[in-house]
Amino acid sequence: MKIFLDTANISEIKEGIDLGLVDGVTTNPTLISKEAGGSKKYAEIIKEILKIVDGPVSVEVVSTKSDGMVEEARKIHALGDNAVVKIPMTDEGLKAIRKLSQENIETNCTLVFNPIQALLAAKSGATYVSPFVGRLDDIGQDGMQIIDEIKTIFNNYIIKTQILVASVRNPIHVLRAAIIGADVVTIPFSVLKLLIKHPKTDEGLTRFLEDWKKVSPDGKFII
């Protein structure tokens, strides 16, 4: 399963890359607006992310009409070969996805909340579908259940559209996505850090270092 970072923060992206754990990045206008300010402009941030990330980088359109979405998508696509255009799951969005698919521009259908929406996006030619599991949890549903259902539907019909699990809130979401067989999970940097940490790991490391001081009182490596 691929891991994308859901952020527009350059420092977070660079640290994730240094860890060897970042296969791509997803952004949205909210995330980018948090970083845009002072000398940094919206487009500059997008260009910088596209430059430092080898994998796919999702950048969202803001138009609500298909013609506007397509126009914005072409501009996003021109910024880099790894740019993926995020298109909302609406009737106008589906029209745009179909058109962009015909132009070989990769798309990520966002704001998906049920399996049928995912199927429709795939039929329109979306490269990725992004079901928002955390937001479904917020209203009392089991967000990960729809990932399981989407996976079953896509397997039934050998659909190549990739399942990109979004709105991830915790490591359990990541675990369940991996067990189900989702193609990608996009996570905040804070969740990435939680995946690495475990109290027993910290406890074991502390014990090893304490025991090492019995061999080398100053703690230095002596080989």
Swiss-Prot record:
UniProt keywords, alphabetically: Cytoplasm, Pentose shunt, Schiff base, Transferase
Family listed: Belongs to the transaldolase family. Type 3B subfamily.
Name assigned to this protein: Probable transaldolase
Organism field: Thermoplasma volcanium (strain ATCC 51530 / DSM 4299 / JCM 9571 / NBRC 15438 / GSS1)
Function field: Transaldolase is important for the balance of metabolites in the pentose-phosphate pathway.
Cysteine pairs bridged by disulfides in the record: none
Domain of life: Archaea
Keyword Ion transport: no
Single biological process term from Gene Ontology: carbohydrate metabolic process
